[in-house]
Amino acid sequence: MALVSRRSTRSESTSITKEEHTGEGSLTKLFFRWLVTLEGDQDINDGKGYISLPNVSNYIFFLGGRFRTVKGAKPLWLGVLLAIVCPMVLFSIFEAHKLWHTQNGYKVLVIFFYYFWVITLASFIRTATSDPGVLPRNIHLSQLRNNYQIPQEYYNLITLPTHSSISKDITIKYCPSCRIWRPPRSSHCSTCNVCVMVHDHHCIWVNNCIGKRNYRFFLIFLLGAILSSVILLTNCAIHIARESGGPRDCPVAILLLCYAGLTLWYPAILFTYHIFMAGNQQTTREFLKGIGSKKNPVFHRVVKEENIYNKGSFLKNMGHLMLEPRGPSFVSARKPHEAGDWRFMDLSPAHSFEKIQKI
């Protein structure tokens, strides 16, 4: 009798779920889930990726998977967004009109400011909300022993053959969290809870990883921020110099001048560092591993080493970075997937060999 009652309860709950998905309430629910997807739905085995990806990652999706961010992290990216938008608003209200109607042809500087500002904002959004190169989960599943024990050989590094005996060895490693053999230069991000191709670092300012598919947008964002600050500084300096009443009559110009001068340096230092790294085909993780330090690599003495990925010249390396295809999105948030797709399944955590031995 208990078994029959359980079956009837399950059938009733299933029918209720089907009714919910076919009623008017389901349309509202689906709309809000499309608008903001905070948690994945365990009851839905198929559908778009943005519905299932939150089950196996720390991502939050917006507008049907078109934008993403990481939950649980400090919202520093909101401060960066305000730092981009607020100067443009103040410049548009108090400065643009006066510079536009001068006799000496300062319209070009106004146009340049808005042009580089748009590039800065667009590249920031692209860097912060796009797929950095997330690798699919549960591709290389081993036959787990008792108590979900991973075989010991899965904790070994595999060295790949290279065409050069001078450069360092290329190794691949098994990720017990994502359960895949990671490709070279890939790494697991504990903040996002995903493995990322050509993982450079997790940037707290954009709340996203910087990897193969968004590194170029990150560089464009830094360059756009630098040029926008320089042009804003120039425009405000011209306004102050041309003001007949002195600096007291243009307080907003002085405010923007100080702001542009202060916000120029950090992006400039960061951009210089990453240009050197990209020009040598080296990631931040590889650089930190080479110097054996976890400190801020921007202020560390540069140590140039042999690199199998180096194309031989700065221009070739930069061209390879900026012009090569970004590669496919292996775990697309907008494409549908079928029921039983293991890439979107949150499997029981496997224990390490060492942990089992202690037990």
Curated annotation (Swiss-Prot):
| PTM comment, free text | Autopalmitoylated.
- Indicate the residues that form the catalytic site: C203
UniProt catalytic activity: L-cysteinyl-[protein] + hexadecanoyl-CoA = S-hexadecanoyl-L-cysteinyl-[protein] + CoA
Gene Ontology molecular function = palmitoyltransferase activity; protein-cysteine S-palmitoyltransferase activity
Could you tell me which residue ranges are on the Lumenal side of the membrane?
Answer: 97-104, 239-250
Effect seen on changing F218S: In ERF2-2; loss of function
User: Mainly resides where?
Assistant: endoplasmic reticulum
Descriptive protein name: Palmitoyltransferase ERF2
What species was this sequence derived from? Saccharomyces cerevisiae (strain ATCC 204508 / S288c) (Baker's yeast)
